[in-house]
Every structure is written in C-alpha cells, then in structure tokens.
C-alpha cells in the first residue's frame, strides 16, 4: 500500500503567513478502466484493512513464508509513502505566501513540481489500476486493519492531516517495516546453507573460469598460427573439387556423346550380334542427346557429333538390312540357331523403323511368291509327249526344309476330279509348308512383351497372306476353267465336294479373310452355280425338245426324261448332309428347289397343253396325277426336300378333287341326273350341315321336273347302277396310285349317293313320287354303304 502524508514541514521553499498544510490537489489519474468500481472500493476500505490485518496475524502464526510476503509489502508501502511526502512538500512550496510561483519563482522549481506530480499520479494510478481482485484487496486491508488494532492506536489519529496524524502514520510505518524486516530475516536464514554451498561452488567455478581462460588463450594463439594453413587447405580442396567436377563432366560427356574406336569398329565392320545392337543403341542415344548441345550458344559441337553418329547409325542400318535380306533369301542358313536369333534381333530393331521393315518384308514376300508361282506353273504347264499324252515332271519343292521332289500332278482331261484333287492337295501342302516356314522365321522364342508378340502375330499373318496371294490367280483360273468345261452332273458335284472340303481346310489353316480362303469360297460358289447351270440347261433342252413331247401318249404314263432327270440328281441329293442343298443360302436353296421341282412340273404341264391328243380333261388329270406321283415317290425318301413334298401332296389333292368331280359328273350323266344336279345347285347347293326341302320348292317351275321324266330316270338308274362300280374302276385303270383310284371311286360314289338321297326327299315332297331304290340300296350297289352309314350318323349327331 502507498502511504500518502497530507502535511509537509519543508520551510526552505515556502514563506508566508499560512504555515498550515494544504490538501494535495486533484491528480489526473488514468484509471478509466476502474472508474466504475472506484467508489465501491473506497467504501469497502475499512473492511479490506481489517481483512489485511487479520491476514498478517495469520501469517505470523504460519511461519517464515508469510513473513517474507509481509516484508515485501512493507517495503512497497514505505516507498509510496515517501513519494507522497515528497509531493506534499512540493505542494507546500507551491502554495507559499504571496504565491512565489506566480511572483517570479523560477521555472526550474515549477518544473520539478510538475514532474513530481506526474510521478505521483503514475504511481497512484499503478496502485489503483493494479489488476488485483477485490477479494485480494479486501484481505490486504483487513490484515492491515488487524495489524493497526494490535498497537492500540486510535484510527482517527492515523488519518489526521496534522502533525499527530503524520507521526502516527510514521510510527505505523516503522512498525510495519520492523515486522517486514523480521519476516525477511527469517526468509534469509532459510537460504544461509544454500549460500554457503554456493560460495564453495563459487571457488570451484573461479578455478574453472581461470582454466577456461588459459585454454581459450592457448586455442586463440594456435588458431592464429593455423588460420593461414587452413586457408591454404581450403583453397586446395576447392581447386580439387573443381578439377574433379571437370573430370567427371568430361568422363560423362565422353560416355554420353562419343563412341570409342572399338565401338565404331563394331558398328562399321563387326559381326551383327548382341554387342552390335548394344553399341547401336548407344549411338542412337548419343544422337538423341545431341539436342542438348544444339541448344547452347555454339551448336557446332552438337552438329559434328550428330553428323558422325548419324553416319554410323545409317551404316549400321544398311548392314542390318543387307543381313536380313541375305538371310531371308537363303533360308537354309536359318538352321543355325545363332543366326536365327540374330535375324530376330534385326527384325525387332527394324520393326521400329517401318519404312525399312516394310521394304525388307516386301522383298521377302516377292521372292517367296515368285518361288511358289514358279513351282505351281511348273506343275500345270507340262509338255505333251510325242503320242499326245500329257507328260509328267517333277516339281521343285516349295518346302524350305524338303530336299526331295514331290509326287507330280497328272493333268488329264478325262479325269478332272483327280486333277483338281491333286491340284488343291498340292496347293494345300504349299500353304502348310509356307505357313510353318514363315511362323518359324518370324516367331520369337522370347518376346519382350505380349504387345510385341501380338504385333508379330499380325505381321506373320500379313506376310503369309501376301505370299499366298500370288497363288490365287493361277489356281482360281485353272480350277474355274475345269469347272466351266464340265457338263456331267455327278462330276460337277464331286468337284464341288472337293472344292468345299479344301475351302474348309484352307479356312482352318489360314483365316476367313485370307486371299486363298476367299478364292476357294469363290470356287465353291462357281461349282454351285455350275451345278445349277447344268440342271437349268438340261431342263431348257427338255422344254424345247420334240422327242420329250413325243414321249407323251395315251397310256398316260410319265415321260422317260423325268425319270432320267431324277436318276442323276436324286443320288446327289441323297448324299447331302447340310441344311440346304449344296450348302446354298436360304434364298439360293429356294431358287434351286424351284429349279428342281417346280420347273419340271411346269415343263410337263406345258407339253400336255400343247399336245392335241389329250382332248379329254380326265386324261390330262390322270397324266398329271401320274407325273406328280412319280416325282413324289422320288423325292419322298429325301428329307431335305420335305417342303416340296408337301407342295406336291397339295397339288395331288387338288387334282384328286378335280378328278373326283369329273367322275361324279360322269355318273350323273350316265344316270340322267346331271341336269337336275345343275338345277338344284342353281337354287341352293347341297350342304352336309343343313338341308331343308322347302328351299328347293322353285324346282317345280322347271319343265324338266315332272313325274314322267323321273320315271325314265328311275329306269336308267336301275339299269346303270349295278354295273356302275365296274365302269368307274375301268375308267381309272390308267391312274397309277391305287390309293388315289380308291379315293376317287369312293368319294365320287358317296357324293352321288348323298345327292340321290336328297333328291329323293325333294321328289317325295313336291311330286309325291320317289325312286325305286333307296339311297342305302344305291350305296350298297356302289360299295360305299359303310361310308354312307357313317355320314348319316355324323349328320344325325351334329343335328
């Protein structure tokens, strides 16, 4: 706490009548932060003082730690009290008689006063603005209050402004300071052992400091002598590092941008092996790294190095190309694994240079293609001997590994099947041998990656296709010539089978997109077209042939040409195992079916129509029926033409219905009922589902419909019907299928009985007259009694 005295007895500066002390003027304290709580703090001053005094009393009982805090507080209080007394003295001096400051007091005293005032303001503001909590301030003042009460002094004397108050405060201050000194002494006693130990340590540290000083002096002296040496060593190390750097730069430059004499010799004249490609790779890297040298100010060095490296690289590439071409032109040299491995390295290198690689491949393809074509032509273009027979000759083997001659191809115009078989077998052997050769040459034992492996598989396929493409034109030309010249259906079919077989073999060996496979497929198509053409030409000649028309006679049997036609064709169809004939497409198969079935039927019907001997429609129907029945019997065992069998059955059913109708009309005419049949049908045709005699009442208006006419008809029926069945069967004797004869006879007779029975009901209704025989009796005489009985039951059940 700061002690502030309100009186001053400094008479040196103040003279006048008023010797009493005056209150200290107001101070401008910067206590804005505590202005709101200052009143509250002053009002609780007594409480704080009492708490402070109590707190001090408690501290005395607690021991040496509390006395130390009290000593510090007393010292601080004494300090601020002295400052307050100084300010009071200056205030008295300022307010002396006659106003010494106003009447010429020197400016120095006034300035000292202002300075003291500012100092006191600062000190007081520090105390009042100290960031102490209210609780702590309360305890401090309470302790102070308790301490004051212990001396039995009046509190009023302590706050008086006069001499008594000043003396009381000084007395209190002395007591507080005395107590503070005691407390501090107790604290200092605690540190006395430590101080003794520190003095011992001080002696030792002094010795160490002396030793350190001596050592430092020695080091400094030595450093002065060695500094020059160190400087020189440093310079030498720097120079050494620079030299090493230059040396490393030169070594690296030489390693990256130059080839030694041996490496140049390897590229220019050395053997092509692993070392050659290693040096070549280094030369290419040097050439690529020269771009760095070209970017400097003087690019001449880079240009010279690039020129030299380019020369070596070009020379090396030429050597690689020459080696590759020479090796591929003499494939016997590939028996050496080392040479084959070197060839693979060359091709792997050239693959990255497409223009060079393409030239090498094209050269190889041209040479192999020429060899294959020469071999093929040597087989085909043989010389005839003096007797005109085809001579045979040995062919040069197209197989690289074969040293023996193969079996020659016999070119014979009388055996085209054997010739084409031998020819295609020879071509297939060429394809297999050439494919194996190319694969063995261009397949690497150890590929660097799957991508490279796939790339060379594509290259192998392309090379094989290009080489074998040379055979396409001569093979296709020769086989097409033989196919076009052949006129026998069986021979053409055998050729077709051969070509189709080898087409599948070539497709399996090569691929669908290879030129050879495409050529064989075109030959298959040509043989298919030739088969269809042979059949079409044969039918065209039959269409215009007079002999074919003359084969038709009154015996109503099918002509011989249709038997001969199917006798050649059906064995071929019977051998077919594919879904379509000759493996045609669906559209082509449909067209061929029309050529096979529809066109012969059309030609036959034209011949019937143009032949005048068949004036009877019944004979025409029987002849057509017999013709279709013959075709049906030929085609029925062959499952591949089942659709056409169904169509022919439908045509036969149509003809059977027409023939049945003609036979019914013949029976009606023989019985004299044909006109009545027409009259009834004009009114309303008979129906098995519904019949009512009232519908036919208009028949009475017809002049022919009377009893006398019916009596005549009854007599005719009685005379004809007993022999009618024999007459019907005799008229159908030339109809070949017995089942059709029975069907026509039964259906015609049954229809007649139905008509007869219904007409009898009409007669009974409108003429009250009926025929002598009933419909069941007529059915019995015609042999259809069972069929008619079933019909009556069926009508009765449906009604």
Swiss-Prot record:
GO terms for cellular component: Golgi membrane; Golgi transport complex. GO terms for biological process: intra-Golgi vesicle-mediated transport; protein transport. It is a peripheral membrane protein. It is found in: Golgi apparatus membrane. Its main location: Golgi. Keywords: Golgi apparatus, Membrane, Protein transport, Transport. InterPro entries: COG6, COG6_C, COG6_N. The keyword Ubl conjugation does not apply. Acts as a component of the peripheral membrane COG complex that is involved in intra-Golgi protein trafficking. COG is located at the cis-Golgi, and regulates tethering of retrograde intra-Golgi vesicles and possibly a number of other membrane trafficking events. Belongs to the COG6 family. This is Conserved oligomeric Golgi complex subunit 6.
């Amino acid at each position: 706490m700061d002690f502030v005295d309100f009186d001053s007895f400094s008479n040196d500066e103040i003279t006048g009548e008023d010797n009493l002390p005056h209150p200290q003027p107001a101070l401008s304290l910067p206590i804005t932060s505590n202005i709101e709580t200052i009143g509250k703090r002053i009002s609780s001053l007594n409480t704080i003082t009492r708490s402070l005094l109590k707190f001090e009393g408690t501290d005395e009982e607690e021991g040496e730690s509390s006395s130390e805090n009290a000593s510090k507080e007393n010292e601080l209080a004494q300090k601020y009290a002295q400052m307050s007394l100084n300010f009071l003295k200056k205030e008295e001096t300022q307010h002396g008689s006659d106003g010494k400051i106003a009447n010429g007091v020197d400016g120095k005293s006034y300035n000292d006063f202002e300075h003291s005032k500012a100092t006191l303001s600062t000190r007081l503001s520090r105390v009042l603005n100290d960031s102490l909590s209210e609780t702590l301030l309360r305890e401090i003042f309470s302790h102070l209050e308790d301490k004051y009460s212990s001396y039995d002094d009046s509190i009023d004397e302590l706050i008086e402004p006069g001499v008594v108050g000043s003396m009381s405060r000084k007395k209190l201050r002395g007591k507080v300071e005395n107590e503070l000194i005691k407390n501090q002494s107790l604290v200092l006693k605690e540190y006395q052992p430590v101080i003794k130990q520190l003095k011992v340590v001080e002696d030792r540290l002094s010795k160490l400091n002396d030793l350190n000083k001596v050592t430092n002096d020695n080091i400094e002296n030595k450093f002065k002598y060695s500094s020059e040496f160190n400087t020189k060593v440093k310079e030498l190390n720097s120079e050494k590092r620079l030299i090493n750097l230059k040396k490393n730069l030169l070594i690296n430059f030489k390693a990256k941008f130059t080839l030694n004499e041996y490496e140049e010799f390897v590229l220019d004249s050395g053997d092509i092996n692993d070392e050659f490609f290693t040096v070549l790779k280094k030369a290419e890297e040097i050439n690529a790294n020269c771009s760095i040298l070209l970017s400097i100010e003087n690019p001449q060095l880079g240009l010279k190095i690039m020129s030299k490296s380019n020369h070596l690289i070009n020379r090396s590439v030429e050597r690689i190309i020459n080696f590759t071409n020479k090796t591929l032109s003499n494939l016997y040299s590939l028996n050496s694994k080392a040479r084959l491995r070197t060839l693979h390295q060359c091709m792997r290198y050239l693959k990255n240079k497409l223009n060079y690689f393409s030239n090498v491949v094209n050269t190889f393809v041209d040479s192999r293609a020429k060899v294959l074509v020469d071999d093929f032509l040597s087989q085909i273009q043989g010389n005839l001997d003096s007797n005109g027979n085809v001579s045979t000759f040995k062919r040069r083997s197209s197989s690289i590994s074969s040293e023996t001659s193969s079996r020659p191809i016999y070119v014979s115009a009388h055996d085209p099947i054997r010739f084409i078989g031998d020819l295609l077998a020879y071509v297939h052997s060429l394809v297999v041998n050439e494919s194996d050769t190319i694969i063995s040459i261009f397949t690497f034992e150890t590929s660097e990656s799957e991508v490279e492996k796939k790339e060379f598989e594509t290259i192998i396929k392309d090379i094989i296709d290009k080489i074998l493409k040379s055979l396409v034109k001569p093979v296709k030309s020769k086989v097409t010539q033989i196919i076009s010249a052949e006129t026998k259906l069986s021979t053409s079919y055998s050729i077709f089978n051969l070509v189709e077989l080898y087409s599948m073999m070539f497709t399996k060996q090569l691929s669908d997109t290879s030129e050879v496979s495409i050529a064989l497929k075109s030959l298959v198509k040509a043989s298919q077209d030739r088969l269809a053409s042979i059949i079409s030409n044969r039918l065209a000649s039959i269409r215009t042939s007079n002999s074919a028309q003359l084969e038709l006679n009154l015996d109503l049997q099918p002509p011989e040409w249709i038997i001969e036609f199917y006798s050649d064709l059906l064995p071929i169809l019977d051998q077919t195992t594919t879904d379509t004939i000759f493996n045609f497409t669906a559209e082509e198969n449909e067209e061929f079916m029309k050529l096979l079935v529809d066109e012969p039927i059309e030609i036959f019907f034209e011949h019937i129509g143009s032949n005048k001997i068949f004036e009877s429609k019944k004979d025409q129907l029987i002849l057509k029926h017999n013709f279709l029945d013959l075709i049906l019997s030929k085609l029925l065992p062959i499952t591949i033409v089942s659709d056409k069998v169904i169509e022919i059955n439908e045509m036969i059913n149509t003809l059977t219905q027409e023939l049945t109708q003609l036979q019914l009309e013949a029976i009606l005419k023989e019985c004299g009922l044909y006109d009545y049949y027409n009259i009834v049908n004009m009114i309303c045709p008979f129906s098995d589902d519904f019949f009512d005699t009232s519908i036919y009442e208009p028949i009475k208006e017809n002049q022919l419909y009377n009893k006398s006419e019916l009596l005549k008809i009854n007599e005719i029926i009685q005379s004809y019907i007993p022999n009618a069945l024999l007459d019907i069967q005799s008229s159908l004797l030339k109809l070949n299928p017995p089942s059709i004869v029975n069907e026509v006879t039964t259906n015609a007779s049954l229809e007649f009985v139905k008509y007869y029975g219904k007409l009898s009901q009409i007669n009974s209704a409108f003429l009250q007259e009926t025929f002598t025989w009933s419909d069941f009796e007529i059915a019995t005489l015609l042999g259809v009694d069972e069929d008619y009985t079933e019909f009556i039951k069926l009508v009765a059940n449906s009604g």
